[in-house]
UniProtKB/Swiss-Prot annotation:
Domain of life: Bacteria
Name of the protein in question: UDP-N-acetylglucosamine--N-acetylmuramyl-(pentapeptide) pyrophosphoryl-undecaprenol N-acetylglucosamine transferase
Membrane topology type: Peripheral membrane protein
NCBIfam families: murG
Group of enzyme by EC: transferase
Family: Belongs to the glycosyltransferase 28 family. MurG subfamily.
Entry-linked PANTHER family: GLYCOSYLTRANSFERASE, UDP-N-ACETYLGLUCOSAMINE--N-ACETYLMURAMYL-(PENTAPEPTIDE) PYROPHOSPHORYL-UNDECAPRENOL N-ACETYLGLUCOSAMINE TRANSFERASE 1
Keyword set, alphabetical order: Cell cycle, Cell division, Cell inner membrane, Cell membrane, Cell shape, Cell wall biogenesis/degradation, Glycosyltransferase, Membrane, Peptidoglycan synthesis, Transferase
Length: 348
């Protein structure tokens, strides 16, 4: 039985695609590499043996801090190399982020293949720096190839978990015959977007809509608005069922969320996270805007009136929502997980 080490940590955008690939490799012995006290620990649970290393990014101006981070990176590379050798790992798969540096370099030192999945339209720093050490870089967006001209790449889109491909029942008290708006701040939440949305919600409720608002865990005012038609949750595991039922989403533009919107044919109003590295969420969102699947507003330009009026207009014109839904589905790649799984198999 082949042995795979998955290095995926931090946010849902890194962890969920990795879980989607893992589901297609049930004949592999899989081990998971993460970081302490992050999202992956609860999501992976006891499905796979779980290992952790401590890694940090270099976002500091302090030379002493940078040196400390560099020494920590070197230490973590050798930790992962030791893990690879002890567990007789055959191939490493990573979805990027800080943890990918240690995983890719350890795989290189161990002489085994490393497959990197870059989900964003604009490649991250880790991808740009370390793609040369990878067997292949799998791309979430076809246009990303232009930023990695000398790297072996293949476009596969971004994997989602298997439940997105089958109808999922929704365990929330929402009637079948009412419009449903879903607010998605990403796995880390989005307090500023939450504040804006709460100013708009009363108008949408008056129209008869229900709103499910995923606030994240760090919003101090998450429960400040109370109404039977307004459901707030810090996190919801059945995103497949929720988006399958939704008429419209208001969302950040992380690559994983966008893929889930496409698979479920959900029209969207996108608000890119303004502090994302190299503004990659804006580039992600533009693909959906160009396709006619979404509207996009920068956070600094979006007001409660603009958002209220746009959502109200869309709810009043189901034909517009239907057209956006059709355009969204055209962006979906239904076999992304299978393509990545095959890439991993073929690398050994």
């Amino acid at each position: 039985m082949a042995r795979l080490l998955i290095a995926a940590s931090g946010t849902g955008g890194h962890v969920f695609p990795a879980l989607g690939v893992a589901e297609k490799l049930s004949d592999y012995e899989i081990q998971w590499l993460g970081t302490p006290n992050r999202l992956e620990q609860s999501l992976v649970g006891d499905r796979y043996p779980f290992h952790t290393i401590s890694v940090e990014g270099f976002q500091t101006r302090s030379p002493i801090k940078k040196l400390k981070i560099l020494l920590g990176l070197l230490s973590s590379i050798f930790e992962v190399k030791q893990l690879i050798e002890q567990q007789k790992i055959d191939v490493v798969f990573t979805t990027g982020g800080y943890i990918a540096s240690s995983a890719i370099l350890a795989a290189k030192l161990s002489g085994i293949p490393a497959i990197l999945h870059e989900s964003n339209y604009i490649p991250g720093k880790v991808t740009k720096l370390l793609s040369r050490f990878c067997t292949t870089v799998a791309l979430g967006f076809e246009g990303t190839k232009q930023y990695l001209p000398t790297t072996p790449t293949i476009w596969v889109s971004t994997p989602v978990r298997s439940q997105f491909y089958t109808s999922q029942p929704l365990d929330l008290n929402i009637p079948n015959d009412v419009p449903l708006i879903v607010i998605i701040g990403g796995s880390q939440g989005a307090v500023s977007v939450n504040q804006l949305v709460r100013q708009c919600v009363p108008y949408w409720l008056e129209m008869g809509a229900y709103v499910v608002h995923l606030t994240g865990k760090n919003d101090p005012n998450a429960n400040s608005l109370q109404d039977p038609q307004y459901i707030t949750l810090p996190f919801y595991d059945n995103m497949a069922g929720l988006l399958q039922r939704a008429d419209l989403a208001v969302s950040r533009a992380g690559s994983g969320t966008l893929t889930e919107l496409a698979i479920t044919k959900t029209p969207a109003i996108l608000i890119p996270y303004p502090f994302a590295a190299e503004d990659h969420q804006s580039f992600n969102a533009q693909v959906f805007v160009d396709a006619g699947a979404a509207y996009c507003y920068q956070q600094k330009e979006l007001t409660d009136k603009i958002l209220t009026d746009l959502v109200s207009d869309l709810l009043n014109h189901p034909d517009k929502l239907k057209e956006m839904s059709n355009k969204s589905s055209e962006l979906a790649v239904m076999d992304s997980s299978e393509k990545l799984a095959k890439l991993i198999r073929d690398s050994i």
